[in-house]
Regions:
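A short beta-strand micro-motif
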Residues: 2-9
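Residue-level detector of beta-propeller blades
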Residues: 5, 52, 58-59
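Glycine-centered tight beta-turn/hairpin loop motif at sheet-sheet or coil-to-beta transitions
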Residues: 9-12, 32
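Short N-terminal binding/cap micro-motifs at the start of the first secondary-structure element
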Residues: 12-15, 82-83
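Acidic, low-complexity, intrinsically disordered interaction modules
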Residues: 16-53, 105
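Active-site helical microenvironments for divalent-metal-assisted chemistry
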Residues: 60-204
């Protein structure tokens, strides 16, 4: 598999991958909280006498999916704000990403609220090529509205990626210094988060 990020003015930052079955390149367009996969010819990027020559960078598989997760989170969470009134992507999402270590953890961190708070579904993540491990991590960290918080935490704890990301998520949510005013509901929520954090840190 081959992965690229285009750097020309028109398609700057857009991701391209080689579809082995069709033996053709597809560009992923992400805008207006939607994504699409379209065929793209890379011939102009290889011809020295064109403006597009060499206007791309090669990405590893890890770099590609990390950047794809970042772009999806940024677009699909657009217009949302966190409890501190800060842009959701640059605030909460980025803090959670910075709180984990591995590339897989960071990918799940970027996507950890997409199934609950955006129109993205796990089927979309499958279509976009994310690994089963990453998709399951996102599913496990997404709370089903019908399940209790206790059952939810059990599910999170059973998946290593979901657990690592949830600990980072809780760490950010417990930081009351980011709030302009601290209400009683915030204090109650903090106690809930502290108990959840302790539970997830405990070794079974």
């Amino acid at each position: 598999m081959r992965y690229l990020k285009l750097t020309d003015k028109k398609n700057n930052g857009q991701l391209v991958f080689l579809d082995k079955e069709e033996n053709e390149y597809n560009i992923i367009e992400i805008k207006n909280k939607e994504y699409s996969l379209k065929y793209i010819s890379l011939v102009p990027y290889y011809l020295e006498n064109t403006e597009l020559y060499d206007e791309y960078v090669e990405l590893t598989e890890e770099e590609y999916f990390l950047e794809l997760a970042r772009q999806l989170a940024k677009e699909y969470h657009k217009g949302q704000v966190d409890k501190a009134g800060v842009d959701y992507f640059s605030g909460h999402i980025t803090s959670v990403v910075n709180g984990v270590s591995t590339v897989e953890e960071k990918i799940v961190a970027y996507l950890h609220d997409t199934l609950e708070d955006t129109e993205l579904s796990y089927l979309d993540l499958m279509v976009l090529g994310f690994s089963d491990k990453v998709i399951n991590g996102v599913i496990f960290i997404t709370k089903d509205k019908k399940e209790s918080y206790e059952d939810y935490l059990k599910h999170v704890k059973s998946h290593e990626l979901a657990r690592a990301v949830k600990l980072s998520d809780l760490t950010n949510n417990m930081d009351l210094s980011r709030l302009k005013e601290i209400a009683e509901v915030d204090k109650r929520r903090l106690e809930k988060y502290k108990k959840a954090y302790k539970y997830l840190k405990e070794q079974d």
